[in-house]
Amino acid sequence: MKLFGTDGVRGKAGEFLDSFLAMRLAMAAGIYFKDKSITNNILVGKDTRRSGYMIENAIVSGLTSIGYNVIQIGPMPTPAIAFLTEDMRCDAGIMISASHNPYYDNGIKFFDAHGNKLSEDIEKKIEEIYFDDKLIQASKVDMEKIGQAKRIDDVIGRYIVSIKNSFPKDLTLKSLRVVLDVAHGAAYKVAPTVFKELGAEVIVMSDKPNGLNINENCGALHPANLAAEVKRLRADVGFAFDGDADRLVVVDEKGEVANGDSLLGVLALYLKEQGKLQSSVVATIMSNGALKEFLNKHGIELDTCNVGDKYVLEKLKANGGNFGGEQSGHIIFSDYAKTGDGLIAALQFSALMLSKKKSASSILGQVKPYPQLLTNLKIAEKKDLDKIKGLKELKKDLENKNINTLFRYSGTENLIRLLLEAKDIKLLEKEMKNVVEFFKKALNG
């Protein structure tokens, strides 16, 4: 049984991800980190899902039972956990979140002492420990050595300072009217505070979490309400975050939702113009062909990697780069953060608008993405794609029609993601129907 997916362990809370799994997984991770322990402290944060309380208590039980002390900081963005784990000199950090998923899902992500997401090799080692009954039992400590847990509520200030430090000192947001959609999620306190302290006129949406409304018709996956509000209020820009605030969607002053690759492109060029861009930009295999064209036109190389912001960061480290991201809105400025950070990306785009004295639409309009169609198809089983009869011929046929393809399984759900890209949208719509029918037969019998 495989526990880890694309971004940690994720599933339906109380079913796959129940208190037993959370406790045992925490013990397994704790056993792994014990060998490298310096402070014997592990940081635990969460988003605003109701199930977070259950999972947090289970994690604390697991860690303290093997002698670890736990620092609980409550609802905070995922990138805050990455930052605070290193800043507070903890052996590891744990974030309880299912990111953009509905409230009934939850997940567990791990960070090492430096705030980095774990490699697949380390995740595999933790999985092996998880299934080793003898090792789990042997790791339990005597009563006198059981760890302690304490809750700290004021660490939000540390993260706010670090975020504000990413914004140019010679600029102010005083001239900007900004609408923020915080998705009833982990950024509901942090995001408005940062923008207000930097001087912006701030209108906040979806900032009343009740444990069951995270990402519900709001945030990065549902930006329509934000778009309407930006237009109605004649705001300069709108920023939508997802439940754990590691991704960003931008809405321009006309109420148009920006393509994630357009955002990547203009931010990369902004870094280059400041002399801050190191090496090539990294995007994933799902990036739009227009992004590469735009970057190459401006003398910037583009490298690609697998889907997932941790793979973007790994590639950046290998290349000596400092900027990359995903079309979905995970954007990494590695000079400031170890993971995708929606707040940092929002501030950098604001700085770009202010320094250029241009509107959001005129800046984002520099990159004109090719039409793409993405279908998430629910499937019964995940067969090896290389062994599906007729798939090779299907891809060749699409290639002959100048259609780029990407077919990949979700790392966290029983889905296959079907992506087609071409200059002709009508052709895409026609061919997508054929592709969906092909995979329905191949994977659903």
From Swiss-Prot:
Full protein name: Phosphoglucosamine mutase
For this protein, what post-translational modification is recorded in UniProt?
Activated by phosphorylation.
Concerning SUPFAM superfamilies, the annotation shows: Phosphoglucomutase, C-terminal domain, Phosphoglucomutase, first 3 domains
* Comment on bound cofactor: Binds 1 Mg(2+) ion per subunit.
Q: Which GO terms describe its biological process?
A: carbohydrate metabolic process; peptidoglycan biosynthetic process; UDP-N-acetylglucosamine biosynthetic process
The family note in this entry says: Belongs to the phosphohexose mutase family.
Cofactors demanded by this protein: Mg(2+)
The record ties this protein, via NCBIfam families, to: glmM, PRK10887.1
Catalytic residues, per the record, are 99 (phosphoserine intermediate)
- Gene coding for it: glmM
Q: Which residues form a coiled coil?
A: none
Q: Where does Mg(2+) bind?
A: 99, 242, 244, 246
Reaction(s) catalysed (UniProt annotation): alpha-D-glucosamine 1-phosphate = D-glucosamine 6-phosphate
Q: Which residues carry this modification: Phosphoserine?
A: 99
Q: Which CDD domains match?
A: GlmM
What this chain does, per the entry, is described as: Catalyzes the conversion of glucosamine-6-phosphate to glucosamine-1-phosphate.
Recorded GO CC terms: cytosol
Per the UniProt entry, the Enzyme Commission number(s) are: 5.4.2.10
